[in-house]
UniProtKB/Swiss-Prot annotation:
Interacts with NUDT9. Keywords: Mitochondrion, Phosphoprotein, Repeat. InterPro entries: GLOD4, GLOD4_C, Glyas_Bleomycin-R_OHBP_Dase, VOC. One of its GO terms (cellular component) is mitochondrion. Disulfide bonds: none annotated. SUPFAM superfamilies: Glyoxalase/Bleomycin resistance protein/Dihydroxybiphenyl dioxygenase. This is Glyoxalase domain-containing protein 4.
C-alpha cells in the first residue's frame, strides 16, 4: 500500500495578481484555499522572510488526490531572482493550451503537441495539448541535479521513491511514489545547481508516525535537515507536523503528517473570495509607487 503522496510545489510570487491570472485563467486551475499570515513561518514556508505573507493553493481538484501549486506571496517583495534549479512543471490539458491562445499568453512549441510557457516570475510550464489520461492533469515536476547517481540514491534509497524510467546517457530519471501520482523528474546539468532567491520547495505527506523515523534516518546518513520536526499552526485550521529536508543539491523537501494535513487541506469554498479580497486590499504596490520606490527583490 502506498503511504506517501506527492502534494505540491511551492512557488514564490512577486506579482500576485498576474500569477493568479496565469494559474486560474490560463492553466484553468481553481483556488482551493487561501490563508493570510501576519508573521513568517517557523519552517520558512514563505522563504527567509519574517513579515506578512499569504499562501494560496491552486489546482485542478481537491488536494487529497491532486498535485497542486502553493503560491507564496511576501508583502513588499516584488520579484525573486531565478536560479537554474526548477526546470518546469508538465501538465496535460488541451483546455490550458486553448486558454493561452485565447488570452494571447505566449506559447512556444517545443515538440509535437507540447508547448512551453512561463508563469510570471519566469517559472517554466510545459503544456501537452491533449486530455489527461489520469484524473489529475499535472504529470511531473522537473528539478535540476548535478550528480544523477547521488540524487537517485537519495530519492530512491533514502526517500523510498520508485524509479520509473532512467537514461544514464541523458542524465535523466523519472521517479514517483505511485503510478497515479505526479512524478519527480531529475535532469542532470553541467555545473552546480543554483537556487538563487526564487527557490521553491516540493512537499510530500507520510503517516505522522513516520516523521521521527525519517528525521533519524537523515541524521544517521548525515543528510541535511533544514527544519527538525516541528508543529505548524494555521489560524482556525488543523495543526500539522513537518520536517524539512534538503537533497544533495539543496532542493528543499517538506514531509508533513498525512492525517492532519488532510484536515488542513480541505477545500475552502470561500478560498477564491478570500484571495480576491486580499488582492483588492493589498495596497503595497501603490504605497511603493507613491513614494517612488521599487518593491524589494527577494
Amino acid at each position: 500500500m502506498v503511504t506517501r503522496r506527492a502534494l505540491h510545489f511551492v512557488f514564490k510570487v512577486g506579482n500576485r495578481f498576474q500569477t493568479v491570472h496565469f494559474f486560474r485563467d490560463v492553466l484553468g486551475m481553481q483556488v482551493l484555499r487561501h490563508e493570510e499570515f501576519e508573521e513568517g513561518c517557523k519552517a520558512a514556508c514563505n522563504g527567509p522572510y519574517d513579515g506578512k505573507w499569504s499562501k494560496t493553493m491552486v489546482g485542478f481538484g481537491p488536494e487529497d488526490d491532486h498535485f497542486v501549486a502553493e503560491l507564496t506571496y511576501n508583502y513588499g517583495i516584488g520579484d525573486y531572482k531565478l536560479g537554474n534549479d526548477f526546470m518546469g512543471l508538465t501538465l496535460a490539458s488541451s483546455q490550458a493550451v486553448s486558454n493561452a491562445r485565447r488570452l494571447e499568453w505566449p506559447l512556444s512549441k517545443v515538440a509535437e503537441g507540447v508547448f512551453e510557457t512561463e508563469a510570471p516570475g519566469g517559472y517554466k510550464f510545459y503544456l501537452q495539448d491533449r486530455s489527461p489520461s489520469q484524473s489529475d492533469p499535472v504529470l511531473k515536476v522537473t528539478l535540476a541535479v548535478s550528480d544523477l547517481q547521488k540524487s537517485l540514491n537519495y530519492w530512491s534509497n533514502l526517500l523510498g521513491m520508485k524509479i520509473y524510467e532512467q537514461d544514464e546517457e541523458k542524465k535523466w530519471a523519472l521517479l514517483g511514489y505511485a503510478d497515479d501520482q505526479c512524478k519527480l523528474e531529475l535532469q542532470g546539468i553541467q555545473g552546480a545547481v543554483d537556487h538563487s532567491a526564487a527557490f521553491g520547495r516540493i512537499a510530500f505527506s507520510c503517516p505522522q508516525k513516520e516523521l521521527p523515523d525519517l528525521e533519524d534516518l537523515m541524521k544517521r546518513e548525515s543528510q541535511s535537515i533544514l527544519t527538525p520536526l516541528v508543529s505548524l499552526d494555521t489560524p482556525g485550521k488543523a495543526t500539522v507536523q513537518v520536517v524539512i529536508l534538503a537533497d544533495p543539491d539543496g532542493h528543499e523537501i517538506c514531509f508533513v503528517g498525512d492525517e492532519a494535513f488532510r484536515e488542513l487541506s480541505k477545500m475552502d469554498p470561500k478560498g477564491s473570495k478570500l484571495l480576491d479580497d486580499a488582492m483588492a486590499a493589498d495596497k503595497s504596490d501603490e504605497w511603493f509607487a507613491t513614494r517612488n520606490k521599487p518593491k524589494a527583490s527577494g
